[in-house]
Regions:
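An N-cap/entry alpha-helix motif that binds or orients negatively charged groups
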Residues: 25-103, 209-269, 406-407
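Short, basic, glycine/proline-bearing loop/turn elements
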Residues: 111-117, 160-166, 255-261
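Alpha/beta enzyme core
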Residues: 172, 176-342, 350-354, 358-361, ...
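A gly/proline- and charged-residue-enriched helix-loop-helix capping module
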Residues: 135-156, 160-174
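Glycine-rich active-site/cofactor-binding loop and its immediate structural neighborhood
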Residues: 106-145
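Long, low-complexity Q/N-rich tracts
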Residues: 1-26
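Glycine- and other small-residue-rich loops at beta-strand/loop junctions that grip anionic moieties
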Residues: 54, 118-122, 142-143, 166, ...
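Alpha/beta catalytic cores of nucleotide-metabolism and tRNA/nucleoside-modifying enzymes
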Residues: 25-70, 322-342, 347-411
């Protein structure tokens, strides 16, 4: 008989189920200004960052401002919106924080605050900050105590700069600085009514263009541990105060300029000097350091178009009045007569909205842009400003605010 047929092959095993897709990666943590601060601390010698933060721990004015911001809770919904802000945004709509500051269009009610010696945080620091502000669409205020001279910074951006000038005892020096700012096309003059320089800098920065001399061993080792920063400073075109070159007979190095400035800067308002500056300056005049009603009235009498409520320059030995605590009364007194801005401790878009809710038409940020500058140059400054813009939009969305145009005390 024929052999039996072979047994049928076993059925194929059932197809294996495809492996489950890997879980999506966790979303990146939300960027904050505090993250840029940590990056800046890794890149900068502690000496430099501590001077920017007015010592360690951070100075009493900063602490007072931060406490005031932390203690302010916005009312939910449109009840907490700034005066004049547009409310009733549709669900999911993107708010528009664009506004006008001192007659200029601004993508948000924020300007970069004047910061002395920003060019020590990154080569060409003021130019990089001005370019980032230009791209984001907000004003940039250049300090008279900048490393890059006003002519170079103004030439780097098409938008006119704001120029900040401390009140000096030497009026001819102020006249010379005003002439340079006007020739460079600056449209707004910000006069700081009282100024106080960081005390350690004159002791720790020597001659030869501002390189640190006379440091302790730990400070010298700290600088050596940050070679990228040190090499950038050595290669920089400017390492002193570019706007003060030629003003001081003793020389143009920081070792000569900073002691001269400490003797020159007024620590209390001189309203006669302010009126004299008003007569010289053809553009807009803004007074920085207004905290009290009498100062607000004096600002109007001097013909100022704007004030900045700020405790900058407060006595480091006393607890200063927080800017946001002084803001509501100043805003009420000047409503419709003068633009009111504020600064002090602004670290988030929520902080911006809090200041607006108290009557400001805008705020100035100082340390926030310095952290970005130290962390990643021009891109870091832009990142800091984009963070503030995104956080402000989120805060507006939570409050049902659709836009800022016409809000605050802008005139």
């Amino acid at each position: 008989p024929p052999p039996p047929p072979p047994p049928p092959p076993p059925p194929p095993p059932p197809p294996r189920a495809p492996p489950p897709p890997p879980p999506p990666p966790p979303p990146p943590p939300r960027a904050r200004i505090a993250d840029l601060r940590q990056q800046a601390r890794r890149r900068l010698p502690r000496l430099l960052l501590d001077n920017a933060e007015r010592g360690t721990p951070e100075g009493p004015g900063w602490r007072a401002n931060r406490r005031a911001l932390a203690g302010l809770v916005l009312k939910p919904g449109p009840a907490g919106a700034p005066t004049g802000a547009r409310t009733g945004a549709p669900t999911g709509a993107t708010p528009d924080p664009a506004t006008r500051l001192l007659g200029e269009e601004a993508a948000m009610p924020v300007a970069i605050a004047p910061t002395a010696l920003a060019g020590l945080f990154h080569p060409r620091g003021e130019i990089l900050g001005a370019r980032a502000a230009q791209r984001v669409g907000i004003p940039f205020c250049l300090s008279a105590l900048s490393v890059q001279p006003v002519e170079q910074v103004a030439a780097a951006v098409p938008r006119p700069l704001w120029f900040q000038l401390p009140l000096l005892r030497d009026r001819e020096a102020m006249r010379a600085l005003l002439a340079r700012a006007s020739a460079a096309g600056c449209a707004t003059l910000v006069v700081t009514l009282s100024a106080r320089l960081p005390v350690p800098l004159p002791r720790r920065f020597g001659q030869g263009g501002g390189l640190p001399l006379g440091l302790s061993l730990s400070q010298a080792l700290d600088i050596l541990a940050h070679p990228g920063w040190a090499l950038g400073l050595l290669r920089a075109e400017h390492r002193s105060l570019g706007n003060l070159r030629g003003l001081v007979p003793e020389g143009d190095g920081l070792a000569s300029l900073l002691p001269w400035l400490q003797a020159q800067c007024l620590t209390a308002p001189d309203w006669q000097a302010v009126a004299w500056l008003r007569g010289l300056w053809p553009g807009r005049l803004v007074l920085k350091g207004v905290l009290r009603p009498a100062e607000a009235h004096a600002a109007l009498d001097c013909g100022a178009e704007g004030v900045i409520v700020s405790n900058h320059g407060s006595d480091a030995g006393a607890e200063p009045l927080p800017s946001l605590q002084a803001l509501p009364e100043v805003a009420r007194l000047l409503r419709g007569r003068c633009a009111v801005l504020a600064d002090g401790g602004i670290r988030s878009g929520g902080d911006v909205l809090k200041a607006l809710s108290l009557g400001a038409c805008g705020v100035l940020v100082g340390r926030a842009w310095l952290y970005g500058l130290a962390a990643d140059g021009e891109a870091g400054v832009e990142r800091a400003l984009r963070i503030l813009h995104a956080e402000l939009c989120a805060a507006m969305r939570r409050g049902g605010i659709s836009g800022m145009s016409g809000g605050g005390q802008e005139t």
